[in-house]
Amino acid sequence: MIDVIIRHQASPLIESALVYQSITIIFGNAHLQSSFRKRNVILAAMMRTRIPGLVPRICQTPLPWKRPTQMTRVRYARWSTSHAVTWLETGHIDLKENEGLLFINNIFPSRLQWLLRGPLGGMRSYEAAVKRIDRPHLAASDTFQIIQRVVPKNLNVQVKEVVPRFREGGAFVKYTRPGDVNDADIEASIKENLKEHPIRPWFNPFQEVQVCRVIGRPWIEDLYRLPSPRLKVSFHPVSPEASAADLNTETLYTLFRPYGKIRDIETQPSDGKVTPRYAYVEFSRPKYAGMAKNCMHGFTIPEQEGGGKSGTRLKIKYERKIKLSMIKDWLLNHPRIVIPVLAALLAAITVTIFDPMRTFFIELKIKSTLQTEENGVMQWIRKQVNKANIIYFGRKGADPRGLTAIWEDRQEDITRLQSWLMENVETFIIIHGPRGSGKRELVLDRALVDYKYKIVIDCKQIQDARGDSAKIARAASQVGYRPVFSWMNSISSFIDLAAQGMIGTKAGFSETLDAQLSNIWQNTATALKKVTLEHRKKNDNDSHLTDEEYLEAHPELRPVVVIDNYLHNASESSVVYDKITEWAAGLTAGNIAHVIFLTTDVSYAKPLSKALPNSVFRTITLGDCSLEVGRKFVMSHLAYESKDGKTQPRRAEELEDLDACIEALGGRVTDLEFMAHRIEAGETPRGAVNRIIEQSASEILKMFLLTPETIEQSWTHEQAWYLIKRLAESKDGSLSYNEIVLSELFKENGEITLRALEHAELISIAAVNGCPQRIRPGKPVLRAVFKKVTENKALSSRMDLAIIAKKINKENKSIEKYEEELSLLGSLPRQPRELTDRIQWLLNKVYSSQNKIAKYEKESAYLQKILRSEH
């Protein structure tokens, strides 16, 4: 019958193997062994060749069959899932009568689990890895070989189940014993066997395998709880109605010392409110703590051993020591301390690592021009290119813009500026003049053309940038400050906002525009000082001087910082200009560099005086050139283009209106240059001037008359039109400053409005001894522009109507105020004699205002009639 079963099951190989194995284990006699030996070899060979991936290594062997031992049966049952499901689902190992439980440690490499499986892997992947790396033929390498060697052969026990605890490096071994043998004797025999025959696993040859009897009811769980040498022992009552005892240190020491060296025992304070009561037991090694936890968890201490009247049950779990995870928890739980400290560390790292790099790049920016000019290879290449250009294109003049006439007229200013740079005067140099007067060209192309070290900062680019990040990036690019993480400022602001919500105050991660600009200018000052001192030698005549004394003694060696467009689009509280002025004052006072300000704003003295209050500034004012110089400039420009071969020389009759056109344009360099370009393009001087006037008229209409008014605007359309009309009608092209301030449209904040219009370059204010005296057009050509704008009758009538409407509205408000006071005086029961003059004055005011209204209405009617007649 057994043969029939085997033959019937031989087709599916795996089922045949299982039936064969089961029958062999159940009927393990000699007849069956000899009957199935040949079938076993053939069946194993077929299973290896057909389905090797599904057959365990134990079956893939050519060796003859041997009767399975008890430990072999343990091996087969060990990797099955039926037992695992049982104790994982219940959390406990059920023990029947005559059954016991041992815990064996140091049989799994708990320290090397990260090599065997991922952090999210389960127990199954770990078992598979152990199967792959275990080598049964090596001593103490197979975990089941270790278990077999732990239990003495002469000990009459049968191993029923092995429950691994991979994280703790051990396993529970469930066994059955005869009725006349107790668990304590079995434990003693096993320990004696290990003492005589110690076992050292392959992964830890310096420590031995240890075994202890489980006297509690261990909790088998697969939670993510890592072993620790520190245990938390909680004292629970046996039943809900009973009470647990608070074990003292001596009792705990007696209970836990057999499992290993104890480092410390810490009991709960007597006044502690936490229940159940607990104590901390810290072992010297984690394996001792694992042994104690697995053997003592669930153990009930009887009354005679200090467990109280009804006994005390121990519940044990690992208490994690202060390691990285606890440091992380502490950091997360104390943001008021951590966030400011992180901000300080970040600032320290920035200063230590990035600031030297930034200073180095600024030095490269300062010396970039000089390095190119002094490089012999670059000089040779430049010379060869110039020779080739002369051969191919012909020799060109040295002044392509024809500015020689301008520089000859301003040679005195150039010489004065160069002499100031050789003097040791701790003050600013200011070059003031209207836009287009040639300030930048005079400084950079003439006065500083042969100067070694110079750096130019254009305030217009910084001030016109939108947002703090853009301003920081522009300022950094001006001086070569890199690396700059301007985009991090926005992210840091969000972090600061979140920190403010958590701790109530800002953490300081984000730096304000003020702080960022301070860092940029401070690094620039450091680079300027290094550049000046790098050529100083130890054996020169000034070697005995300190760096500060050396800088003071050699003003000719200092770099020059040119700050262009100073006070462009400035407001009352501009951080950009405040930091630049403060930094420039430090450069000047410390003899680090000469500072030259180029500005069109006449109020430059106010912010600069705050930075250097006790200094007298060196000032050069550039105005419009004279008629003679303007003619020379235009003619030299045209002569250069003729020599270049691009245009033919103009005949004298074609330039007969040149003087009149130059007089109409005035001496503004940019306007004269534009006219010269138009003449080169084939236009007559008069046509070029008309084109300039038309373009300027369009700009005036757009900026001051037709664009809707904004809150930031400090003037009204009516005020701008009033000045345009008055300047167009004036004989000498100027108005009295005091007369305009006292006019009806400028009585309220008149001076502020005039300064704003001057800043917008509609007008210019001429001062005598520091006091405003005359009002003129912003540039000479604007006088002709104003005349052209006022020739538009429709526009003129509409703007005059707006002015008259404002005047009528103002007089009506005055009459309302006078009438309110008259009504108040009329409500008195009797009229005192002292009020007669006041009443008469009010009546006269009402009469005067009413006459003005009547006059304005007549003018308004006339203007409306003109406006209706225009098509």
Curated annotation (Swiss-Prot):
Residue stretches spanning the membrane:
337-357
Q: Which UniProt keywords apply?
A: Membrane, Mitochondrion, Mitochondrion inner membrane, mRNA processing, RNA-binding, Transit peptide, Transmembrane, Transmembrane helix
Q: Which Pfam families match?
A: RNA12, RRM_1
Principal localization reads mitochondrion
Mitochondrial intermembrane side residue ranges read 358-871
**Known PROSITE patterns for this protein?**
RRM
Q: Single Gene Ontology BP term?
A: mitochondrial genome maintenance
Describe the location of the RRM domain by residue ranges: 229-321
Intracellular or extracellular location(s) = Mitochondrion inner membrane
Gene Ontology cellular component annotations, sorted alphabetically:
mitochondrial inner membrane
How is this protein situated with respect to the membrane? Single-pass membrane protein
For this UniProt entry, the molecular function terms from Gene Ontology, in alphabetical order, are: RNA binding
Q: Which PANTHER family match?
A: MITOCHONDRIAL ESCAPE PROTEIN 2 (PTHR32198:SF2)
Q: What does the function comment of this entry state?
A: Plays a role in maintaining the mitochondrial genome and in controlling the mtDNA escape. Involved in the regulation of mtDNA nucleotide structure and number. May have a dispensable role in early maturation of pre-rRNA.
- Entry similarity comment: Belongs to the YME2 family.
In Swiss-Prot or TrEMBL terms, this protein is called Mitochondrial escape protein 2
Organism in which the protein naturally occurs: Aspergillus fumigatus (strain ATCC MYA-4609 / CBS 101355 / FGSC A1100 / Af293) (Neosartorya fumigata)
